[in-house]
């Protein structure tokens, strides 16, 4: 059983404040939720289990039980998860406020300990002090947290997470912030709590405390597209697709890291709860992460042999050719922008091949084919530059005064011609490597200009940022029919 979950269940009965704050979905009646996918720690109840995606940010970080309350660590409502979430630069005073909140919600004194022991002993065969029956009393106060970086902000979600060595398939990594506070002060807080426990339970408490307060922080994990809801990934190739998210909001004022201080003023806390409401947002999935996922999908299904072929048709419209026909039933081709990029890039590369080499048929096995797939993933700059340089080196360039040149005297389609005119000023007959790079960049940037894209989707924005974008009518970014250039 998860220690934090048990503590919330038992301490919820102490008073009105605890009943409001410590209410977890995992301790209530179960309701149906989306299928689970990843193994990790539920941020709401801190247990290690199968996770489903959060309705607030679309990241897998909530269990199927807690999902019914729809809480997200990015909410603007002072529920327990939000009050345990800190952002960016954390001070010693912030951590002191967190410890005070733990002491308010999970007090340990002689009266509390006796009450829980008496309640437990009312059941048959529970006269012994077995740790599993007193799990709620054995939750030490630590500065253990799960951390994630989103849109330049670093979030720390504090809690008591059991079994830290278990499988972690989430983008969250364990971070220990005890050095920002003070080891001796935290030891004193826990030794004081431990002194009220029976001797048998003190040993278990001490083991748990030191194992969770002296660990070495993990390396930061990189968030990627697979950490988001599968529903998003399945619909990315629909240009009109919008992600629907919900956020719990209230009239909560003050700095982000001061939310945990609200439990010290019960009256103010309940006044804020009266203003609680849910806000709905339809946001664009447009971001560097998902764009790279789409471009990689294109690179897997294209036919590099088209670059050495003589077909009159565009790359995505070739049929009945063993080497060049693409499977148009793949979902990736539902996005007309990806079709356009594929057609233009391969048309341009083919024009370069025909202008500079004697390769005459798509059945030829040429070295240049091995570089073509990577030319679509413009997000991976190093691999992309290597790919373009490899293609250029296969074109039998001519060196003049230390600069290599290639010819362009083969026909190109109208889209490619327009790209060359816009970026070079005309349709050139001689190109340098930089000209080739500029042209290929432009064909992709016309639709997906990653230079001006955020790394993660807007689902990872705070409520304040979402409201600002909504007010400026930029929450859905661009109309799907317009390119970045337009």
Swiss-Prot record:
Residues 317-486 are annotated as: Interaction with host IRF3. Residues 42-79 are annotated as: Zinc-binding domain. One of its GO terms (cellular component) is host cell cytoplasm. The keyword RNA-binding applies. Residues 82-176 are annotated as: Important for cytoskeleton localization. A motif (pLxIS motif) lies at residues 480-483. Its main location: host cell. The C-terminal region is phosphorylated by host CKII/CSNK2A1. Phosphorylation of the DSGXS motif is essential for host NF-kappa-B inhibition. One of its GO terms (biological process) is symbiont-mediated suppression of host cytoplasmic pattern recognition receptor signaling pathway via inhibition of IRF3 activity. It is found in: Host cytoplasm, Host cytoskeleton. Residues 1-81 are annotated as: RNA-binding. A motif (IKBKB-like degron (ILD) motif) lies at residues 479-483. It comes from the Viruses. One of its GO terms (molecular function) is RNA binding. Keywords: Host cytoplasm, Host cytoskeleton, Host-virus interaction, Inhibition of host innate immune response by virus, Inhibition of host IRF3 by virus, Inhibition of host IRF7 by virus, Inhibition of host NF-kappa-B by virus, Inhibition of host RLR pathway by virus, Interferon antiviral system evasion, Metal-binding, Phosphoprotein, RNA-binding, Viral immunoevasion. The keyword Metal-binding applies. The integrity of the zinc-binding domain in NSP1 is important for degradation of host IRF3. Plays a role in the inhibition of host innate immunity by inducing the degradation of key host factors required to activate interferon production such as IRF3, IRF5 or IRF7. Associates with components of cullin RING ligases (CRLs) including CUL1 or CUL3, which are essential multisubunit ubiquitination complexes, to modulate their activities. Recognizes the host NF-kappa-B regulator BTRC through the presence of a DSGXS motif in the C-terminal substrate recognition domain. Belongs to the rotavirus NSP1 family. Interacts (via C-terminus) with host IRF3; this interaction leads to IRF3 degradation. Interacts with host IRF7; this interaction leads to IRF7 degradation. Interacts with host CUL1 and CUL3. Interacts with host BTRC. This is Non-structural protein 1. It comes from Rotavirus A (strain RVA/Pig/Mexico/YM/1983/G11P9[7]) (RV-A).
